[in-house]
Amino acid sequence: MSSLWDKIQEMLEGDFIEDAFPVLVRQGVKDADVFMHSLGCSVWNTLGHELGYMAVAEGPAPVASGDNIRSDSVWFDKGNITPCVLIEFERYDGSERGKAKLITKLTNLMEASQRWDHQPVLLVLSTWSSGLVSAPDFAALEELFRKGVSNSKGSRIPKPTGCSLLLHRMFFRPDFDGILRLKHMKFRWS
């Protein structure tokens, strides 16, 4: 597992984003509509392909009694089509609503893992922020991951077995013209 961790972090901290998505680093992106979300999902999907997976955007988890769950990116093993990595990419603005949204996304990842019979080995909750905002409470999110959560229907979702969690944050700084450029990333592995 640690080799997958190492590869993900090494590529994201290396030249991968600048080479594949130069607009995030050089030209910059206007904070409008959902373009940043599309770019972030594309970063994760492309990274999955680069690491040898069949990466699928908006990958639906098998249907169960709860709501439909579509992870922003699902990385499948090409040989046996097993889901190995589930990813959600979300804006974080530091508000109470933003904090609640991260809990919902983590819950969705955990429930999707359960629906996939706990086959994924890694869940990724990747966030992005524009400018200075309070940090997401990664310790609280890790605690939910370890103890389990309840979904919107009240069903208990236990900690995924044999699975790790990456809490990832992308920091974008707006320039004088309001254009956002990626300045830094933080990785927290559990």
Where are these regions (language model features)?
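Catalytic cores of nucleic-acid endonucleases
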Residues: 92-149
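Short, well-structured alpha-helical interface segments that form or flank functional binding sites
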Residues: 35, 39-43, 66-68, 97-108
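Acidic-basic catalytic patches of nuclease active cores, encompassing PD-(D/E)XK
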Residues: 1-62
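Domain-level recognition of nuclease-like catalytic cores that cleave nucleotide substrates
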Residues: 124-190
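Active-site beta-strand-loop-beta-strand hairpin of nuclease catalytic cores
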Residues: 74-86, 116
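Short glycine-rich loop/turn motifs
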Residues: 70-72
